[in-house]
Amino acid sequence: MTGWQTYSERYPMLTAALAHAKRSDRMSHAYLVITSNPDFRTDFPLLLAALRVCENQRPDGGPCMECGECRQILNGIYPDFHILAPTSRAREIVIGKDSGDPDTLRWFESQFHLSSVSVSGWKIGVIQEADTMNESAQNAFLKTLEEPPGKCLFV
């Protein structure tokens, strides 16, 4: 995975703005990542998540990548990290019948209304290929973005 230092060198304005937002406790509850770079699409949401939950920020404002929360994010074992990606044959994200319907928007959203079990209390959600959401899923997620549950980060 590409680290914070590499992103700081490649995208200094972006990382400086995010680090400042974290230091001043003004990080947004949602970030939209648009890129054709597959590594950026994979790595950057993890770095954002680590920045949000990090217990020991670096002097430059980035995540330490060594505390318990950062290690859990990097190792893919952070208990409140959820990914939604298109899985149907049509390659679209659908709303689903109810919260018990896995890999649907209703299931994904239901994960953020449960109590957090992580030390930081933050819940992280990543929607991969958000442009594949069908119209009903888009409308449902828009409501969540307008009125987000507490201590949630969506990428």
Segments (PLM) and residue ranges:
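Clamp-loader machinery-focused feature within the broader ASCE/P-loop NTPase space
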Residues: M1-S136
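Conserved catalytic/switch belt of AAA+ P-loop NTPases
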Residues: H113-S116, N139-V155
